Each structure stands twice: as C-alpha cells, then as structure tokens.
Amino acid sequence: MLFSVFYLSLFLSVGLLSARRAVPDRSAAVIVPLGCGFGVSLLAVLPALFAVVLGFTLPAAALAAVAAAGIGAALLYRGTRLRGMAKDPDGGALWACLLPVVLITLYLLHTHVLHLVDGAYHTGQSCYGDMPMHLGFIKYIAQSGEFLPRYPLLGGTHRFGYPFLCETVSSVFVVLGADLRTAYLLPVLPAFLSVYGMFWQLARRVTDSAGKACLAFYLFFMGSGLGFAYFLGSADSFAGIFTGFYTTPTNFVEKNIEWVNPIVDLLIPQRATLFGWCVLLPAVYLLWRFCYEGERRLWPWLAALVLPLPLLHTHSALALVLLCLVGGVYTLAQGPRRKTLLPWLGLAAVCGAAWLCQMLPTVLAQS
C-alpha cells in the first residue's frame, strides 16, 4: 500500500507542477485542484501508453513512473516551483465552502466501498449495480495484463467499448500490490478534490463573485429537488433511505419522482462520470481563460490535460467539443482571424489526432 501511495504522490506532484506552470499567476486554491486534475490525467495516460506495448504489467507501470518523473524533472529544470504562489483573498471562502462536502464525501466513500462489517462487505444502494462491474473490470485488467482489454464476461471476443481508463487508474495500484479497496479509492480522492475545487473556481471566474460561486456550488452538489420529502412521513420510511434495498427517492415511481444527487447518485457509483468531470471541469476553467479572457498560450496545457478524456468519460469529451465549438465561433467574431484561429487549430489537431487513435480501436469499433 505504501508503494501505491508513493506512486500516486509522484503523479500528483507532477500534476501540481504542471498546474503551476500553466497558470503561474494563481494561488494554491487553484493550483491544488487543477493539479489533481492534471495528475489524474497523467495517471490515465502514461501507464496506458506503455501497456499498449508491454501489456498492463509491472514493467509498464514502472516505465510510466519514470516518464512522470521525467516530466516533473523537466518542469523543475525550467524553473517551475510550488513555493511563492500568489495570495488569493477568496481562498478562504473556497476551503470553507468545500470542507463540509469533502468530509461528507469521505464518510460516504468509507461506507460505500467494500466496507467490511461483521464479515460482510457493505455498500450503498446507489452502488449495487455499478460497483460490482467496476471492481470486476479493475481486477480483470490487472490480473490478465491484456491491453487493450476485452470484456471478460463475453469470453474475450469483444474489446471494451466502455471508457476503461476510469478503471486502469485503479488497476495500476492492483498491479503494484495494493488490495482492491485501496486501489479503488486512491485515485478517487484527488478526483473528487479536482471536481469540487474546479467547479468552484470556474463559477468564481464566470460570476466574478465568491458568494455566487458558493451558492452555485451548493445548489449543484447538494440540490436535486424536494423528492425526499415523501420519505419524511415516518421514521421507518426515512431510515429505509439508508438501510433498505432500492428504497431511496432516486426513482420513486409511485409519486413520479426522480431525485438524483450528483454526489451519491453519480460521482460515487459512476467512476466514468467522476473521472470525466475530474478532467472536464479543469478543462472548462482553462477553456474559459483561453477563449473569453484571451489567454491563447493556454491551449497546449488544455490539450495535454484532456488527452485521455474520450476513454475516461466519452460524454465529457463530447461536452468539451460542444463548448469549444461555441467558444471558437465567439473568438473568431471578436478578433483578427489569423491570430485567433491558429491556437484553435493547434488544439483541434492535437486533440483530434489523440482522441481518434483512442476511439478507433475501442468505442467506434464496437459501435
């Protein structure tokens, strides 16, 4: 387990250096969640690159660590340092906003992911279907070493069409010797920090108000409507949300209620959504600065960040494409065509080539 923690720390350290290099004018309140996004992206990309040649094996994981260390060394050589970050008067508001939700999330992860109680593994109702699938994929990729992976339940005749990089970010820790629960949780922790922190920073950037960013954060992550009110009529009904078998307000068909909370119904059970948003929200933050604030130098960092996005969460990749199309039209209408167009062409060329190479033998091959 200690070796796995060290391995993750290496990738997160390189991610923090990358974030610092990309936005050197920002405070730790931006660098930390943005760095987590970069770190998870690297954790998805580098082991997979070497696994294409060597299989998903220990040598591939070791070479990925060497490559990550090389990137970190190059950034340090170029003078990138984590000390001396800018001060942010709104940094306290971010951490005060995030801390209660982070604590709730940590508790839910503890109780929902292979929680051993009296010899039995416990989870939450939202994970009944998703978690067995994810655990099976994580273990299979690590044990078989086959890459690109194939669906084990289909006799190995079909390659994954599912965005499997959300599984390999945990499979690599199984290869390194971690138990399944540890491997499952290790990359999830920085992913949540990236999602929460970069949502707040994006809202802060768009609204130009820390107060509005806090309001947007809680409306989104703690919202979902009042469908749970039907379960407040008795103590037994309310307790059933936590102890019953499919007795949550998520799909309460008797009252035509669908109550979906982003944390408990999407991010905790659906790893593809979590890791997709972990990269998408930092990417949209960089896209906002690149597109609407004229920071054209950010396009290589944006491209590097989103390299694994189609095989982390295909829907997030599609969302980013649509946002880029809107942003591209906006910027072309605002400034000189040549100066404006070149960064967009660079972003499109890098992402288009990388994403096509990923999707042709996987998602598109199974369509």
Functional labels for PLM-detected ranges:
Residues 1-91, 103:
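Membrane-embedded, hydrophobic transmembrane alpha-helices
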Residues 1-14, 96-101, 130-132, 269-285, ...:
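Alpha-helical transmembrane segments at the extracellular/periplasmic loop-to-helix junctions
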Residues 11-18, 45, 72, 195-203, ...:
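Transmembrane alpha-helical segments
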Residues 53-63, 85-95, 210-213, 297, ...:
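Membrane-interfacial entry segments at the cytosolic side of transmembrane helices
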Residues 94-103, 215-219, 304, 336-361:
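Hydrophobic alpha-helical membrane-interfacial segments at the cytosolic entry of transmembrane helices
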Residues 103-279, 315:
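Active-site lumenal/periplasmic loops and adjacent helix-entry segments of GT-C-fold
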Residues 264-267, 286, 299-314:
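Membrane-interface alpha helices of multi-pass inner-membrane proteins
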Residues 287, 292-297, 319-351:
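Perimembrane helix-loop-helix junctions
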